[in-house]
Amino acid sequence: MAASGLRQAAVAASTSVKPIFSRDMNEAKRRVRELYRAWYREVPNTVHLFQLDISVKQGRDKVREMFKKNAHITDPRVVDLLVIKGKMELEETIKVWKQRTHVMRFFHETEAPRPKDFLSKFYVGHDP
């Protein structure tokens, strides 16, 4: 009897999960596009304001890379959470709450994925 009550509660909880902002994936994608455009427009100001040693094109390429890194996500709640974090980062950058080193951390060389199988780890020199 108690198990069926727990099962019903779990089913009710899973069906009543409310979205953070977006009702569906289309609305979440719209929010992502808005954030992408805001970042894309802000790159020239950021490069000039922080006197970065990169070009505007390199900055925009990095923005594109950061957005494409999460392109596989299909849950609107997760997308909304990432959009919220992106807006916070954008606000911190615009209002110069960051220092130059904080901004330049985004421009480290892209790391190659670590090997997963034994032989690849052995050849590279990582512990198995």
Swiss-Prot record:
Role noted for this protein: Accessory subunit of the mitochondrial membrane respiratory chain NADH dehydrogenase (Complex I), that is believed to be not involved in catalysis. Required for proper complex I assembly. Complex I functions in the transfer of electrons from NADH to the respiratory chain. The immediate electron acceptor for the enzyme is believed to be ubiquinone.
InterPro entries recorded: Complex1_LYR_NDUFA6_LYRM6 (IPR045299), NADH_Ub_cplx-1_asu_su-6 (IPR016488)
Family in the record: Belongs to the complex I LYR family.
Subunit structure: Mammalian complex I is composed of 45 different subunits.
Native organism: Bos taurus
Gene Ontology terms: cellular component: mitochondrial inner membrane; mitochondrion; respiratory chain complex I
Designated name of the protein: NADH dehydrogenase [ubiquinone] 1 alpha subcomplex subunit 6
Keyword Translocase in record: no
CDD domains assigned: Complex1_LYR_NDUFA6_LYRM6
Transmembrane spans: none
Compartment list: Mitochondrion inner membrane
Main localisation: mitochondrion
Positions bearing N-acetylalanine: 2
Swiss-Prot/TrEMBL GO biological process terms: mitochondrial respiratory chain complex I assembly
Membrane topology: Peripheral membrane protein
Keyword check for Endoplasmic reticulum: no
Keywords tagged on the record: Acetylation, Electron transport, Membrane, Mitochondrion, Mitochondrion inner membrane, Respiratory chain, Transport
